[in-house]
């Protein structure tokens, strides 16, 4: 509550809470996803997994959904904060629910990046490091400073594509209650 100036703002909402999610997920989600496939390759159990009577698509979707369920359970552990805000004031609960939905979607996006990178390496530390760098790049791609670096030599259409990769720009509208 103190880190996001929750009490000083004088508003009953969770916007400061959701402001930290992209940066927190940039570290936590690669840690969750680093073992999804790299450990299977390192230990040699990938052959066993691929010879089971399930399709590769089912295995990929199953691992992704299991990791996403873990992130969902971890995020649901923050529901008491929502109850605290409702006790202290009268927030717009639909905006808070939209923030939670956006947070889950962002976790899914980061998980898909991490799972893809984990499948490309058999070392967990390498998978974590590359996933962190890619997620960091996706977070920064919508910042005006980054876009200004590209604006002098790239067309506007390319800048819009670069900006569309940003998790932050999409999450900004969702955490304010706008789902588009």
Where are these regions (language model features)?
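Helix-loop-helix units of permease transmembrane domains in multi-pass membrane transporters
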Residues: 36-66
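Terminal transmembrane helical anchor/hairpin motif
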Residues: 6-7, 11, 130-179
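Helix-loop interface residues and adjacent transmembrane-helix termini in multi-pass membrane transporters
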Residues: 53, 120-121, 178
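Membrane-interfacial segments
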Residues: 7-8, 41, 45, 85-93, ...
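Hydrophobic alpha-helical transmembrane segments
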Residues: 1-39, 64
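Alpha-helical transmembrane segments and their helix-entry boundary regions
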Residues: 59, 127-128
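Transmembrane alpha-helix boundary/anchor motif
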Residues: 28, 32, 76-80, 112, ...
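Secretory targeting signals
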Residues: 1-3, 11, 24, 65-125
């Amino acid at each position: 509550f103190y880190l996001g100036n929750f009490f000083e703002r004088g508003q009953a909402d969770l916007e400061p809470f959701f402001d930290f999610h992209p940066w927190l997920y940039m570290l936590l989600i690669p840690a969750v996803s680093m073992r999804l496939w790299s450990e299977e390759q390192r230990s040699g159990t990938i052959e066993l997994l691929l010879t089971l009577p399930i399709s590769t698509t089912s295995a990929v979707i199953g691992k992704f959904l299991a990791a996403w369920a873990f992130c969902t359970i971890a995020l649901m552990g923050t529901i008491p904060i929502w109850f605290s805000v409702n006790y202290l004031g009268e927030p717009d609960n639909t905006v808070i629910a939209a923030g939670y939905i956006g947070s889950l979607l962002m976790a899914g996006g980061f998980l898909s990046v991490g799972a893809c990178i984990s499948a490309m390496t058999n070392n967990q530390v390498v998978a974590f490091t590359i996933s962190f760098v890619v997620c960091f790049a996706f977070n920064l791609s919508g910042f005006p400073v980054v876009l200004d670096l590209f604006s002098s030599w790239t067309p506007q259409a390319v800048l819009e594509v670069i900006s569309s990769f940003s998790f932050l720009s999409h999450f900004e509208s969702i955490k304010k209650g706008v789902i588009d």
